[in-house]
């Protein structure tokens, strides 16, 4: 079964989701909406990417859309999500990737145009959040609007799950060392809500807030209130790393932690988590499709209850792959599979 999908917002995540969808046998992008981009410019931005390189397929543009590897993708330029005629192309599932319509009420506007389900590619204040490999099995077909959470939550949640399932996670603090993103500045500029966030991205390490750790409590209810964290935005263009320092209920050695991560990555979290004992640096993970790459040689233990774990993630590519995986999964559930 091939699921027909539309994308609203052809920015960073929208385009990387598109690239991932081309590689996925169960998903077909049939329509894109972005009021700020002309069709020929959309083709250019899909074809060329400074971080992930040139698109491997064939991209052309026509008056009303894109032709990608011989398949036509309709292109709309509606500002109001309620006016996008998704039904014209049969787009049953819509990815909301503008970063603007992130509540259930706002994202539900897509349903008026014929979409059956809306997947928000960002955290949401009220829409149910799902992390593949962690809580996706709790999805029910009556849910119309859902969130794929954040890239950091998608990395942290599998990591925390393995610790909690095997050794009990009492409490933890997370720091994500995160590549800069489009919301940051190329030169110092005004940022009234976050003064530090207005400083030059390529010249500074910038402390920032993040709700990614607390969000783990929403996808793993038993960890609610046990995790919090912060972000350090750093001058790299892509790939980030989670540092989770936590206290375990059971006595554990670091070798036992490694073994649990290795086992999970080969079994229940296969395709979601990977395990590495290589001496990795961030650029080695560019384009990695996993949510969480456990770095076995980077972590340390203070004692048998207090450990520091390190896991990498491509905050663009890995996250976008999960958006597509989530759609394929919920479409299967909706079809009664």
Curated annotation (Swiss-Prot):
Tell me which CDD domains the record gives. Answer: GAPDH_I_C, GAPDH_I_N
Write out the GO cellular component annotations.
cytosol
Which cysteines are disulphide-bonded? none
Self-association state and partner proteins as the record states = Homotetramer.
Please tell me which top-level EC class this enzyme sits in.
oxidoreductase
Under the heading InterPro entries, the entry gives:
GlycerAld/Erythrose_P_DH (IPR020831), GlycerAld_3-P_DH_AS (IPR020830), GlycerAld_3-P_DH_cat (IPR020829), GlycerAld_3-P_DH_NAD(P)-bd (IPR020828), Glyceraldehyde-3-P_DH_1 (IPR006424), NAD(P)-bd_dom_sf (IPR036291)
Which residues bind D-glyceraldehyde 3-phosphate per the record?
150-152, 181, 210-211, 233
Biological or metabolic pathway of the protein: Carbohydrate degradation; glycolysis; pyruvate from D-glyceraldehyde 3-phosphate: step 1/5
Reaction(s) catalysed by this chain, per the record, are: D-glyceraldehyde 3-phosphate + phosphate + NAD(+) = (2R)-3-phospho-glyceroyl phosphate + NADH + H(+)
Tell whether Magnesium is among the UniProt keywords.
no
**Per its UniProt record, what SMART domains does this chain match?**
Gp_dh_N
Extract one GO BP annotation from the record: glycolytic process
The coding gene here is GPD
Q: Which UniProt keywords apply?
A: Cytoplasm, Glycolysis, NAD, Oxidoreductase
> Which residues does UniProt mark as catalytic?
151
> What is the similarity comment for this entry?
Belongs to the glyceraldehyde-3-phosphate dehydrogenase family.
Q: Name one Pfam family in it.
A: Gp_dh_C
Instruction: Please identify the protein, giving its name as recorded.
Output: Glyceraldehyde-3-phosphate dehydrogenase
What's its EC?
A: 1.2.1.12
Q: Which compartment or compartments is the protein found in?
A: Cytoplasm
User: Example GO molecular function term?
Assistant: NAD binding
